[in-house]
Amino acid sequence: MPCVQAQYSPSPPGSTYATQTYGSEYTTEIMNPDYTKLTMDLGSTGIMATATTSLPSFSTFMEGYPSSCELKPSCLYQMPPSGPRPLIKMEEGREHGYHHHHHHHHHHHHHQQQQPSIPPPSGPEDEVLPSTSMYFKQSPPSTPTTPGFPPQAGALWDDELPSAPGCIAPGPLLDPQMKAVPPMAAAARFPIFFKPSPPHPPAPSPAGGHHLGYDPTAAAALSLPLGAAAAAGSQAAALEGHPYGLPLAKRTATLTFPPLGLTASPTASSLLGESPSLPSPPNRSSSSGEGTCAVCGDNAACQHYGVRTCEGCKGFFKRTVQKNAKYVCLANKNCPVDKRRRNRCQYCRFQKCLSVGMVKEVVRTDSLKGRRGRLPSKPKSPLQQEPSQPSPPSPPICMMNALVRALTDATPRDLDYSRYCPTDQATAGTDAEHVQQFYNLLTASIDVSRSWAEKIPGFTDLPKEDQTLLIESAFLELFVLRLSIRSNTAEDKFVFCNGLVLHRLQCLRGFGEWLDSIKDFSLNLQSLNLDIQALACLSALSMITERHGLKEPKRVEELCTKITSSLKDHQRKGQALEPSEPKVLRALVELRKICTQGLQRIFYLKLEDLVPPPSVIDKLFLDTLPF
């Protein structure tokens, strides 16, 4: 910490009044172990001058001094901030003089502890400056600081200083034995302070990052620590006879400084032209307002085609729709799609775009050039519509989006290969175990079908009896259709609704010949190249159709018409990869034939009676019999 140091010799008789009066009080305080330990010696060669023009002459402070002066240049001194800090050295005859400051203000004593002889004053017009107005200014943030020394706020020394009758006797500053510094031209026009160190490289700053300065307004707030105002009044008369005639009765407040702190003072920062707090640079890793892409997980700033996606997935989806591109998955149609692997399988990436809800109808085509696509507004709920007006039918695009979301939600997210075995060991186990596995797979499919049907718009508006009848009548058709869509039958891999992956050999003993019919239907269905919209409509139409025993068949027929209209509208707008309506109708006919074979398989297992069927399967089997 840079500072000005001086050692004092025994005081002359004329300057020891404060020693005689307050010596006993401040001797015990200054020797208290709580005082800061500092080492200061101007004679050391380790102290070096860093500036020669930033301080005014010390002769400004020595006007009227009755001793001889020896000239020394004013400079800044720097000393290492580390090392042991012994107590302030007190020499005989001086240890009781000029220690009227608080123990945090020892820098004033350390700056003036050298003891050369002082020549007479350099000029009659020089004035004595009170040392109590010196304070510490905070360094700029680039200078490393010692745990906080908040500076005292005050104005700079910009005007000529008048005599301060209310200030305290400066003590050792007026020692006749002290050497004076030659005056400078404009010394009285500038404040006494240490200029801030350059930011690069950081150098130790005085007093833990603060600078010594003079503030004439601070003298009005500082005085000797007399302990009480009454003591000052009784001793004012005695001090009138002091050689320097500085009365003490006008200031009764004790001279105290705030304790050291770690935080920088905003007042000092404003004096140095700094902002109270320096804002930290923005963090580029996480920008506010950004989310993650619903397709690959990359950063996404806004929504594209109805879903928050990144620019890469937005462009991929747009190009695929505009060019009617056809993709083929080389794996099992469940490739991982993330930021690193999103370009590996275009088929799975496009299917995931559709599954998260990206709407192809919003993509501009040749008929919509120059216009920005807009998502259709959501239809008003029945409570928001006027009761006198009939509720208009839902727009086809809303029905299509709901069907796609329902189908994707029913698709298992993770595949379970724990039981997959393509070797001859797949046939291990008893016949009863394979039959029980067959029943378990059918039961799991029924639960998935119920949750999927509730997401179809208008299905929950039907009577409960009709809802149950439709689900139970179509449970085998839904089981076969989902199994055909998910499975990679070309490699004999069958993916069931719970994510379980089994080889054909593992299913053959439970499914029998019905498994081969399912495989053929799956190959034919995949050869049709139906998009996910057509598959969603195919799944809905396989359940929502005319059934014997419906209470309100008219409403079921209306719902079926809405689904068919959505499929036609999807094809009419040119968004379908190929005309899908006739293909869907042919697939429905073939699907119902295969379900008849499934009923025959269940009937055969009941007759075999290896394992009793679950009650839900038994009930569904009896309800779906045509006779």
From Swiss-Prot:
Residues 380-627 are annotated as: Interaction with KAT2B. GO terms for molecular function: cAMP response element binding; DNA-binding transcription activator activity; DNA-binding transcription activator activity, RNA polymerase II-specific; histone acetyltransferase binding; nuclear receptor activity; protein homodimerization activity; protein kinase binding; RNA polymerase II cis-regulatory region sequence-specific DNA binding. Residues 1-139 are annotated as: Required for DNA-PK heterotrimer. Belongs to the nuclear hormone receptor family. NR4 subfamily. This is Nuclear receptor subfamily 4 group A member 3. Ubiquitous. Highest levels of expression in brain. Widely expressed throughout the arcuate nucleus region of the hypothalamus, namely in AgRP neurons. Residues 395-624 form the NR LBD domain. Residues 141-150 have a biased composition (Pro residues). Residues 1-112 are annotated as: Activation function (AF)-1 domain. PANTHER family: NUCLEAR HORMONE RECEPTOR (PTHR24085), NUCLEAR RECEPTOR SUBFAMILY 4 GROUP A MEMBER 3 (PTHR24085:SF2). Induction: Induced by inflammatory stimuli. Up-regulated by the anorexigenic signal leptin via the transcription factor cyclic AMP response element-binding protein (CREB). Suppressed by orexigenic signal glucocorticoid that mobilizes NR3C1 to inhibit NR4A3 expression by antagonizing the action of CREB. The gene is Nr4a3. Phosphorylated by PRKDC. CDD domains: NR_DBD_NGFI-B. InterPro entries: NHR-like_dom_sf (IPR035500), NR4A1-3 (IPR003070), NR4A3 (IPR003072), Nucl_hrmn_rcpt_lig-bd (IPR000536), Nuclear_hrmn_rcpt (IPR001723), Znf_hrmn_rcpt (IPR001628), Znf_NHR/GATA (IPR013088).
